[in-house]
Amino acid sequence: MSIDLQQDFFALFGLPRRFRVDEAALEMAYHDLQGQVHPDRFAHLPDVEKRLSMQWATRVNEGFRTLRKPLPRAQYMLELAGVDAGLHTNTAMSSAFLMEQMEWREAVEEARAAGEGHELTQLHHRLRHHAREVFDELERTIDERHDFAAAAEIVRRLMFMEKIQHEIDDALEALET
């Protein structure tokens, strides 16, 4: 068995380096690799081999977690492209997007304050639909235009949207208790 711990996750799973991932192929490759590197297969071997299998298993799990979800996958692709997305330091966004975020937050807060579970659920659905549209834009930006600087801005937008999604989930949970 030979797994190169230095290869990127796409190469590890035998996938092309694209934002759109064949989820079935990823899943199949993951299970195949897990079968090859599972620590139980190395239990009878010397400690060095056991540690190596643990490293391999960890790398496979990390790769799978990264590639199976669109936002971590996009962040990883930016990293591979050498683009510093400034995910935690660069919060500069267009004024239109910032206005949209304020409107989302106000709507969430109003629904939360009024105890409107139905309205929060509607906001949840609208935000998920909007996020799908933005993910489609991200896919085109990465896979077709190969514009990683623009992709970094889209990733930051999606991170804002993810925060609002969590706020809606928290508000719904608070109403249920």
From Swiss-Prot:
Sequence ranges assigned to domain J in this UniProt record: 8-80
Keyword entries, A-Z: Chaperone
Top-level taxon: Bacteria
Keyword Electron transport set for record: no
Transmembrane segments annotated in the record for this chain: none
MF GO annotations: ATPase activator activity; protein-folding chaperone binding
Record's keyword annotation contains Chaperone: yes
One Gene Ontology term from the biological process aspect of the record: [2Fe-2S] cluster assembly
InterPro entries: DnaJ_domain (IPR001623), HscB (IPR004640), HscB_C_sf (IPR036386), HscB_oligo_C (IPR009073), J_dom_sf (IPR036869)
Task performed by this protein: Co-chaperone involved in the maturation of iron-sulfur cluster-containing proteins. Seems to help targeting proteins to be folded toward HscA.
Subunit structure: Interacts with HscA and stimulates its ATPase activity.
Stored PANTHER family: IRON-SULFUR CLUSTER CO-CHAPERONE PROTEIN HSCB
Record-stated family: Belongs to the HscB family.
Protein name: Co-chaperone protein HscB homolog
Origin species: Aromatoleum aromaticum (strain DSM 19018 / LMG 30748 / EbN1) (Azoarcus sp. (strain EbN1))
Lineage: Bacteria, Pseudomonadati, Pseudomonadota, Betaproteobacteria, Rhodocyclales
